[in-house]
Amino acid sequence: MANGADGFECDVRLSADGVPVVIHDATLDRTTDASGPVSARTADELARVDARCRFTPAEATFAAPAPVGVPMLREVIAHFTTARLIIELKDESVRLARLVAALVVELGALDRVCVGSFHQPVLDAVRAAVPAVTTSASRREAQWTLARSWVRWPVPARPVYRAFQVPERAGRLRVTTPAFVRRVHREHAVVQVWTVDAPDDIQRLFALGVDGIISDRPDLAVRARDAFVNTR
C-alpha cells in the first residue's frame, strides 16, 4: 500500500478453532518457522509463528524488521480501512464461506471487498449467505464467459459475479482477448489480470481495456499504471 496500490489480494483459510486467517499455503512449512497444517493450529497459535522468516529483501519488496505472525482476516480488514481487498477462500469449506461473508458485513467492508474461490460450492455459499457481498467469477463461470466471447450470445439476465480475476493465458489459450474484455464489460463486471510484473505488459493490458492488475511488484505496477494514465 505504501507504494500507491489501490489494494491487495489475500488468501484465507480456517484455523483449528474456526477463525478465518490470512495465509496462502495449507501448511506452515514453506513460509513460516513452524510446520504442519494450518488447520491444526488455533488462531492464537498461528499468531505466534514467524511468518516472515523465509523471505529476504531479494525475494520481496517488503521485509518485516520483526517477527510477524499469521494474522486473522478480521485484523487485516480492520487495519486497512481504505484498501480494496480481494479475498480468496482457499479451503473447500462452506463454513469458511459463511464466516467470511458475515465478517465483511460486520466490519462494514461491503463496498471494498471482493470474495473469490476456485471452488464453485464455496462461492455459491457466499452468495447464498449474503447476496450483497461482491464475488468474482468462478473458474467455470469464467470459462463460460470466455466461450460466450467467441460467439454472439445473450448477456445473462442477472450475473452473480462482479469481477473476473484471470491470467492473461491459460496454457496455450489466451484469456484476456479484446472480445473477452468487451464481453465482461457487457456483463457489468471488471477484468483484473494476474500475475503481471513487467511494466510493458501492464501498460499493454491497460490499453486493451482491463480494469486492474494483480502484481507481485506493486512498485513497478503503480509506476506503469500512472505512466499509462498520463498518456491518455
What are these regions (language model features)?
Residues S117-Q120, A132, A137-P154:
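Beta/alpha (TIM)-barrel catalytic core signal, keyed to glycine-rich beta->alpha loops juxtaposed to Asp/Glu
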Residues A2, D6, A78-H79, A128, ...:
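Solvent-exposed polar/charged
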Residues L146-R232:
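C-terminal active-site rim and adjoining tail of enzyme catalytic domains
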Residues F8-C10, L85-I87, V113-G116, T134-A137, ...:
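Hydrophobic faces of well-ordered beta-strands that scaffold small-molecule active sites
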Residues M1-L14, P159:
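Catalytic domains of carbohydrate-active enzymes, especially glycoside hydrolases
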Residues H24-A129, A157-E187:
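Metal-dependent phosphodiesterase/phospholipase catalytic core, i.e.
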Residues L14, D91-S93, P121-V122, R139-E141, ...:
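Active-site-proximal loop/turn and secondary-structure-junction residues that shape catalytic pockets
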Residues G18, V100, L123-V126, L205, ...:
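Hydrophobic packing residues within well-ordered alpha-helices of enzyme cores
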